[in-house]
Structures are given as C-alpha cells and as structure tokens.
Curated annotation (Swiss-Prot):
Protein name: Serine/threonine-protein kinase UL13
The species this protein was found in: Psittacid herpesvirus 1 (isolate Amazon parrot/-/97-0001/1997)
Keyword Cell cycle attributed: no
Keywords: ATP-binding, Host nucleus, Kinase, Nucleotide-binding, Serine/threonine-protein kinase, Transferase, Virion, Virion tegument
Family membership: Belongs to the protein kinase superfamily. Ser/Thr protein kinase family.
Remaining remarks: Displays a substrate specificity similar to host CDC2.
Protein kinase domain boundaries: 95-460
Residues annotated as catalytic: D219
Length: 460
C-alpha cells in the first residue's frame, strides 16, 4: 500500500485534511536542526537543500567521494573528529510515492519507487543519530579498495535528514525470511552453494564489524539479513547485514574517543551527530543481552546459569562480541539448513524446541543446551565430513561447567531426553550430499568452543 506523506512527516506535521477519503498531511514549518558549535551553520537558501532525486553510485565504490574525513581536534589532540560529507545532509527528503515495508522498535522503513531506495524514518533523535553514525562508518568502508569484498555485505548510505530523522539507503528486495518463503522451491545445488558463499561473506563482514570497527550487532536474525537474488534462477547473489538499532561498542571501538559532525552547507545547517557519551550510552543493557537468549552462545548461557549474568554498562572485548554474533549467524544458517532439508526430504524429520524472545528461566536454558547438544551431535556424527570433535560440546563438558548439582542433574536429564527424541524422530534419516557444505558451515559457526567459532573469519 503506497504511503503519500514523507516517512518523517509525522514529526513536523500538526494536522491533516481529508481529500476523497484519503488522508493528506499539511506539514507546518519544520523546526530548525540543532545547531552545533563544531559545525559551520550556513543559512543561505539552496536548491539542493531538499532531496528530490538520488543519483546511482558507481559500481566501483573506490571512485566515489569519501563520506567521512578523519581529523584531529585542535583543542584536544587525544580526540578525533569524524566529519561527514555535507552533501549527504538534506533539510527534507521528498522521494514520494512511498510503499510501506516494515516497522521495528525504533522506526519504520519505506520504499521509494521513484528513486528505488529504502527510506528509514526513526522515532527518536538519539536512536536516529546512533544508527546513522554506525551506518556511515560501515558504508564508508566501501571506499577502501582492500575492503570491497566486505563492503558488499553492508548497505550504502545515500543521504539523511536530521530534521525528519530519515536515512536514505540502498534498497534490497527481500529479507532472508521472505526470500526463503518465495524461493528455494525446489532446493537446488546452485542455491545451496550461493547460500554458503554469502553466509561465509557475512561471517567475514561480522569480523570486520567487530574487530576493525569496534562494534557488535547483537541482533543477527533472518529479518535483519537482506537478500538480492538472481531474477532468472532465484539464487541469492548478495546478502547484507542490516539494522543497527541495537549495535554497541566493544573493546576495539574508537567511538568513545571521538565525535561525528556534519558541517553545514547552503540551505542546510550543520549538525552534531554523536559524541563520546553517545558511544558509552550505546552499551547494551541487561534486557538487550537477555533478549533472544535462544541465539546466545553456550558460554553466555552457562555463565548466566552460574550466576555470572551480563554486566550492564560494561564494555565487552571484541573477540567476545564477535563469538556471540557469529553464533547468532550460525543459528540462522542452522534454520536455513533444516528448512531446506525438510523441503528436499518431503517431511520435517527434525525435533524442534520452541523458544520465545523473552528471558528464559534456568530450566529452559539447560533444556536448550541439551537440545543443541543432541541435534548437533547427531548431525555431525551421521552427516558431516567436517571432522570436528564434539562441536556442540559433551555432556561431561557442559555438566562440569555448571556450578550447582541441581543444575547438573537438570541438564543431564534433559540431555538424555533430547537424545532419545532426536534418534526417534530422525529414524535413520540421511542428508543428501548436496547439503555437506552448509551443514559443515553451520557446525563451525555454532561450535561450542568460541575460539573455533572465531576461525570463520579466515575462511577462503
């Protein structure tokens, strides 16, 4: 359904009128953007103050102008200032008509048919500035020749409006969940090969995100992975990691030592995007870390069961956050593997454990660990040629890592029950050889040992 008003119009409009049954917003004069001493405010009117069209980017992004320039603060040599290209900043974004794509906890996304771009309108100023900063950092990486293979897994930023809290970015047609609903029917070898290639690329992109950028995603799931596919075959040709609403700094970050500004230009006032305190404020709360615990790695779940829960406001190491997000990516690969196997076998031979996104109690967490152990051990021993030893851990290893006897007893009982369930449900089912690579990749990404998980960044 097309949306006629600008995505951010609700933030500058105070009334609407009806025209033939259709609501048409009458925007009032928008409030001026926040002035910043670091930015040069330019008030002269300019024809380019409003975004009415988007020029396509060069295929070779290294020929595009730099989006961010790094400068040392003259009054504080220990602090860095990231200056954003003023040409990206617009007073208003006018790319109608729009088609609504989806809504999340922090804003909504629309598709501009005229410009063939995605337009994300965020609700709050703080979330807008933070997501813009993270998006610009990873988008700017595409301008470095040596990172061209990494850059394809992130969205390119075309423009933004600080008044309307809007970010204009590349449009990718599907998220992974929608792609799987519409494609891979039937499952082909070429589709599986393409999925493995793109998932490996996403793992390397996560390594760059965590280690080079000092950022953790913390919400890797099917809905946050976007897919472009070959129009003829339906095979995925590009997968992109999207939505940095929950992104946080880790121990490798430089954002807690810098600010990001966008200088002014004719018709558009300069803005202060983030400062050091914004990076510190991005540290994940306990609620975020305990959200979707089913995607958290075993070391995180074991610590939680032992009473060593996440420490709110603490900066985690880059290798710790990388292992966490890689496991979440592995969970996505595992979901894709089981879905595609079910389609090829003509039935769903796998037992499933349903988990909510809400924090779990200890009994559910221990049952989840037991389920992972039973299913992954069966798959690796019966189907995989990867040669990993105990990829999901062992009963003894997990049991010995639990401090309290009642927890150990609960886990061992769940492990025995899940092992019987897996064997009975699988009933001798065998995987076709076409699934060997995606199975091995899922085992690696979900490996019990975080050090093994992290080796994925070195994959060819």
């Amino acid at each position: 359904m097309a949306t006629r008003g600008r995505p951010g119009a609700k933030q500058v409009a105070d009334h609407s009128v009806s025209d033939g049954g259709e609501q048409r917003r009458i925007p009032q004069k928008p409030p001026g953007p926040e002035r910043c001493d670091v930015c040069s405010a330019v008030s002269a009117a300019g024809a380019a103050a409003d975004l009415i069209d988007v020029a396509p980017l060069e295929e070779d992004l290294t020929k595009e102008p730099q989006q961010i320039v790094v400068t040392i603060m003259s009054n504080d040599p220990a602090k860095v200032c990231l200056k954003v290209d003023p040409a990206l900043h617009y007073r208003n974004v006018e790319l109608e008509p729009y088609r609504f794509l989806g809504r999340g906890g922090y804003g909504s996304v629309f598709y501009s048919r005229r410009a063939n771009v995605a337009v994300k309108a965020l609700t709050h100023g703080a979330s807008f500035r933070w997501e813009l900063a993270v998006s610009l950092i990873v988008s700017s990486a595409a301008r470095r020749q040596e990172l061209s293979d990494i850059a394809k897994h992130f969205l390119q930023i075309y423009a933004f409006s600080s008044v309307e809290k809007i970010i204009v970015m590349e449009y990718i047609r599907h998220d992974l969940r929608t792609y799987l609903d519409e494609h891979c029917k039937p499952v082909t070898q070429s589709a599986l090969d393409a999925l493995v290639r793109e998932f490996r690329g996403l793992a390397k992109a996560l390594a760059f995100f965590h280690i080079e950028c000092g950022l953790a995603h913390l919400d890797v799931k099917q809905n946050n992975i976007l897919v472009n596919c070959d129009p003829r075959t339906g095979d995925p040709v590009r997968m992109v990691l999207a939505d940095f609403s929950l992104a946080a700094i880790n121990g490798n970050s430089f954002l807690n030592k810098c600010c990001m500004v966008c200088p002014g230009r004719p018709g558009v006032t300069g803005v202060h995007i983030i400062d050091t305190e914004d990076a510190v404020n991005s540290l994940p709360s306990n609620n975020i870390l305990l959200f979707r615990m089913s995607r958290r790695p075993p070391e995180f779940l074991l610590d939680y069961c032992n009473g060593v829960g996440p420490r709110c406001g603490e900066v985690m190491g880059a290798m710790t956050t990388f292992a966490m997000d890689v496991f979440a990516l592995g969970s996505v690969v595992h979901e894709v593997l089981l879905l595609c196997l079910s389609r090829v076998l003509g039935r769903d031979p796998f037992p499933h454990m349903t988990c909510t996104d809400e924090p779990m109690d200890h009994k559910t967490i221990l049952s989840l660990l037991a389920y992972r152990l039973a299913l992954t051990d069966y798959l690796s021993q019966s189907w995989s040629s990867a040669g990993f030893v105990n990829p999901a851990g062992t009963r003894e290893g997990i049991s010995s890592a639990l401090q309290w006897e009642c927890m150990r007893d609960m886990f061992l009982a769940s492990a025995e029950a899940w092992t019987r369930t897996v064997r009975r449900k699988m009933n001798g089912a065998r995987s076709p050889s076409m699934f060997a690579d995606i199975l091995d990749l899922s085992i690696l990404l979900c490996h019990f040992d975080p050090d093994v998980r992290r080796t994925v960044s070195a994959l060819a």
